[in-house]
Amino acid sequence: MPRRREVPKREILPDPKFGSVELAKFMNVVMLDGKKAVAERIVYGALAQVQTKTGKEPIEVFTLAINNIKPIVEVKSRRVGGANYQVPVEVRPVRRLALAMRWLREAAKKRGEKSMDLRLAGELIDASEGRGAAMKKREDTHKMAEANKAFSHFRW
């Protein structure tokens, strides 16, 4: 454990178009090599596609998608007496958001549409309706935790 003082969390400014801190954070997740303008173009393009395809408010679809993807429990490896056990643990709120955003990005990358903004739009719509690759990732994580419920007493 470091003996120095704890470094304060940096405050992320809300994005200029929708005024959402979550969306600004997601843009940072999408960003590669510090190219924020490209990330903004992708995310705003995806949200515009969501608007045209669903007719709903894009920020609401985004929030709903993120909330649907957020995992509640995950498994962590714990070594006990020469054996590794997958111990289910509850996910902290900050990590929930981070995992949801990461899974959303990865699921969008693997889709078949031509451009990233179309892929992201499709994944956002799917996740907001409770389907898609990101939702499957969450369900798989929950299934793993459920299957290893017997080892929950190894929590630390």
From Swiss-Prot:
One of its GO terms (biological process) is translation. The keyword Lipoprotein does not apply. Keywords: Ribonucleoprotein, Ribosomal protein, RNA-binding, rRNA-binding, tRNA-binding. One of its GO terms (molecular function) is tRNA binding. Pfam families: Ribosomal_S7. The keyword Membrane does not apply. One of its GO terms (cellular component) is small ribosomal subunit. Belongs to the universal ribosomal protein uS7 family. PANTHER family: RIBOSOMAL PROTEIN S7. Part of the 30S ribosomal subunit. Contacts proteins S9 and S11. One of the primary rRNA binding proteins, it binds directly to 16S rRNA where it nucleates assembly of the head domain of the 30S subunit. Is located at the subunit interface close to the decoding center, probably blocks exit of the E-site tRNA. This is Small ribosomal subunit protein uS7.
